[in-house]
Amino acid sequence: MRHYEIVFIVHPDQSEQVPAMIERYKTTITSHGGQIHRIEDWGRRQLAYMIEKLAKAHYVCMNIECDQATLDELEHAFKFNDAVLRHLIVKMKKAETGPSPMMKEVQREEAKKAAAAQPTEAQA
């Protein structure tokens, strides 16, 4: 089986459905004997350019190991899901299990927000 990194962008109005979508894709992969090495929910982020008149979208990254039939089924699911604006599947040489550079940035942003919120809570 081959290793893949999948990034898909979800319509911002459908952000509440992202956990269910991830669960559905996880079920598809594992039911066909594949493995999931990493799933990262990058959250709602600014797009580099407008897609369908949208400036922001919800990003999800998955690192998986599966066969071609499973990959074809996933790609078919992405194409016919109206909530998925774009998807990208890249073949990897090995499994990636550590946090991606994008996830590290997301964690840094969350830490800054938490640090900024603590002094205001201390004053109250």
UniProtKB/Swiss-Prot annotation:
Residues 97-124 are annotated as: Disordered. The keyword Transcription does not apply. The keyword Membrane does not apply. It comes from the Bacteria. GO terms for cellular component: cytosolic small ribosomal subunit. Keywords: Ribonucleoprotein, Ribosomal protein, RNA-binding, rRNA-binding. Coiled coil: none annotated. Gene3D superfamilies: 3.30.70.60. GO terms for biological process: translation. Residues 114-124 have a biased composition (Low complexity). One of its GO terms (molecular function) is structural constituent of ribosome. SUPFAM superfamilies: Ribosomal protein S6 (SSF54995). Binds together with bS18 to 16S ribosomal RNA. NCBIfam families: S6. Belongs to the bacterial ribosomal protein bS6 family. This is Small ribosomal subunit protein bS6. The gene is rpsF.
